[in-house]
From Swiss-Prot:
The gene is atpF. The keyword Thylakoid applies. Belongs to the ATPase B chain family. The chain crosses the membrane at residues 27-49. F-type ATPases have 2 components, F(1) - the catalytic core - and F(0) - the membrane proton channel. F(1) has five subunits: alpha(3), beta(3), gamma(1), delta(1), epsilon(1). F(0) has four main subunits: a(1), b(1), b'(1) and c(10-14). The alpha and beta chains form an alternating ring which encloses part of the gamma chain. F(1) is attached to F(0) by a central stalk formed by the gamma and epsilon chains, while a peripheral stalk is formed by the delta, b and b' chains. One of its GO terms (cellular component) is chloroplast thylakoid membrane. InterPro entries: ATP_synth_b/b'su_bac/chlpt. It is found in: Plastid, Chloroplast thylakoid membrane. Pfam families: ATP-synt_B. It comes from the Eukaryota. F(1)F(0) ATP synthase produces ATP from ADP in the presence of a proton or sodium gradient. F-type ATPases consist of two structural domains, F(1) containing the extramembraneous catalytic core and F(0) containing the membrane proton channel, linked together by a central stalk and a peripheral stalk. During catalysis, ATP synthesis in the catalytic domain of F(1) is coupled via a rotary mechanism of the central stalk subunits to proton translocation. Component of the F(0) channel, it forms part of the peripheral stalk, linking F(1) to F(0). It is a single-pass membrane protein. Keywords: ATP synthesis, CF(0), Chloroplast, Hydrogen ion transport, Ion transport, Membrane, Plastid, Thylakoid, Transmembrane, Transmembrane helix, Transport. This is ATP synthase subunit b, chloroplastic.
């Protein structure tokens, strides 16, 4: 890593009398300088982005595992409900003479309650996955935006010098002065 940095420093200070060298003026860069800068950014930035994406991947996988556990629990509840349904059906056969319609209503209520519970759990799982995905995408967008803003600020700060500041201030004073004369 240190050798790579020293080689770039060496190239930047190489005499430019008709030979190859790095142009450090960002506004007058050529294709080779841009290629070197982009290459360095890709080389050093891909590790950070890869780590960020790996962390998000692990969180999403964890959420999926949790959802799968919820699904398994739901299936266990469904199996218990089926066993209970079988029990209710057996009792229905025994009490058919005494209250067939009441038992049938209880059976339908049990099936409906189980179905509603399953739908709610499935909906909850899908919403959790959707929100985790959205949160992951928003965090990645925010990180990329922050890095872009930091890079832009760094570029602007490196391009601005004292003379440019004074020219800008003088131009703005001239504009304000002409506005005062118009009143």
């Amino acid at each position: 890593m240190k050798n790579v940095t020293h080689s770039f420093v060496f190239l930047a200070h190489w005499p430019s009398a008709g030979s190859f060298g790095l142009n450090t003026d960002i506004l007058a860069t050529n294709l080779i300088n841009l290629t070197v800068v982009v290459g360095v950014l890709i080389f050093f930035g891909k590790g950070v982005l890869k780590d960020l994406l790996d962390n998000r991947k692990q969180r999403i996988l964890s959420t999926i595992r949790n959802s799968e556990e919820l699904r398994r629990g739901t299936f266990e509840q469904l199996e218990k409900a089926r066993i209970r349904l079988q029990k209710v059906e057996l009792e229905a056969d025994e009490y058919r003479m005494n209250g067939y319609s009441e038992i049938e209503r209880e059976k339908e209520n049990l099936i409906n309650a189980t179905s509603i519970s399953l739908e709610q759990l499935e909906k909850s799982k899908n919403e959790t996955l959707y929100f985790e995905k959205q949160r992951a995408m928003n965090q990645v967008r925010q990180r990329v935006f922050q890095q872009a803003v930091q890079g832009a600020l760094g570029t602007l700060n490196s391009c601005l010098n004292t003379e440019l500041h004074f020219r800008t201030i003088r131009a703005n004073i001239g504009i304000l002065g002409s506005m005062e004369w118009k009143r």
